[in-house]
Amino acid sequence: MAKFRLETSAERNGRNSVEGVERTVFFISDGTAITAEVLGHAVLSQFPIKITSYTLPFVASETRAEEIKQQINQIYQDTRIRPLVFYSIISSGVKNIITSSEGFCQDIVQTLVAPLQQETGLEPKPELNRTHGLTEKNLSQYDARIAAIDYALAHDDGISLRNLDQAQVILLGVSRCGKTPTSLYLAMQFGIQAANYPFTADDMDNLQLPATLKQFQHKLFGLTISPERLAAIREERRENSRYASLRQCRIEISEVEALFRKNKINYLNTTNYSVEEISTKIIDMMKLNRRMF
C-alpha cells in the first residue's frame, strides 16, 4: 500500500512563506460563530494569506461534528495542506471530535481564557450562547440596539426630521458618501441612534445648513469622499449620467466641504476607510458612548 509522508514544519513554513498562499479556513462554534469569525479574521489579517472560508454555527451535536471532521479531512487528503480551524465550542465531546481532525485547530476563546484564569484566580463558567445569545442580563441592551436600528431606518436620507433630539449623531453628506451604511452599523454594532441628511445636486446653487439642523449643531458630523471615488460609485448606480460625472462630483464635494468648514462641523474623508473604521472614528471624534453586544 502506498504511503504518504507528512511534511515537516520547516517544509510547510517554507512553502507558506510565498506571498499570497491559499488556505482553507473553518470557523466553527456551537453558537453563532461570530466570535470565532471576528477573532479568526483578526489573526489571519496579519498574514499574506488568501482564504477560502467556511463558517459553521450551531454545531451542537457529535453527529454534526463528525460530518465536519470528514469535510476537514477530505480537504486535507485532496490538498495535503491542513485546513486552519478556529473554534469556540463548550461541549467536550464535540470539541474532541473537531480537534481530532486533520486541521490545525485553535480554540479561539480558551487561548485568552487560560491566562486570564491564572491572573484572576477565578474559574470560568462557560455557557452556550452567552456572548451573542439573548438572556435576561442583556435584554435591555438588545432592546436598545433594536430601537437604534429602527431609528436609523426612520431617519435615513432625511426621510424624517422629527425626533432629532433623540439622535446621538446626525451624519451629513452628498449622495453615496457612506451615510446610510455608517448609520446602520453604528446602530447594529454599538446601539447608537444615528440620523443622516443628504445634500443633493439641487442644493448646490445656494447650499446652506437647514434651519432644523442648526439647533442640533453639537450632533452634526460630516462625511466627505474623493470626487474620483464618488464618481465611480455613482457610475454603478446611474451610468453616464450628470449625477455620476466627475465634474458634478467635484462641485458637490467642494461645496459641502466649504459648508462644513463655515459651520465648524467636524468631518471625515471616507475614501480609504471601511464602514467599521468610519464608525469608530465618528465615535472617537464625537465622544459617543459605545456599547458592545
Curated annotation (Swiss-Prot):
Q: Does the keyword Kinase apply?
A: yes
Q: Which InterPro entries match?
A: Kinase-pyrophosphorylase (IPR005177), PSRP (IPR026530), TF_DNA-bd_sf (IPR008917)
The positions annotated for binding ADP are: G173, V174, S175, R176, C177, G178, K179, T180
Q: Which UniProt keywords apply?
A: Kinase, Nucleotide-binding, Serine/threonine-protein kinase, Transferase
Question: Which EC number(s) does the record attach to this protein?
Answer: 2.7.11.33, 2.7.4.28
Annotated GO MF terms: ADP binding; ATP binding; DNA binding; phosphotransferase activity, phosphate group as acceptor; protein serine/threonine kinase activity
Q: One biological-process term from Gene Ontology?
A: regulation of DNA-templated transcription
Respond yes or no to whether keyword Cell inner membrane is given for this record.
Answer: no
Q: Which PANTHER family match?
A: PYRUVATE, PHOSPHATE DIKINASE REGULATORY PROTEIN 1, CHLOROPLASTIC
Q: Describe the family membership recorded for this protein in Swiss-Prot or TrEMBL.
A: Belongs to the pyruvate, phosphate/water dikinase regulatory protein family. PSRP subfamily.
HAMAP family under this entry?
PSRP
- Tell me what this protein is called: Putative phosphoenolpyruvate synthase regulatory protein
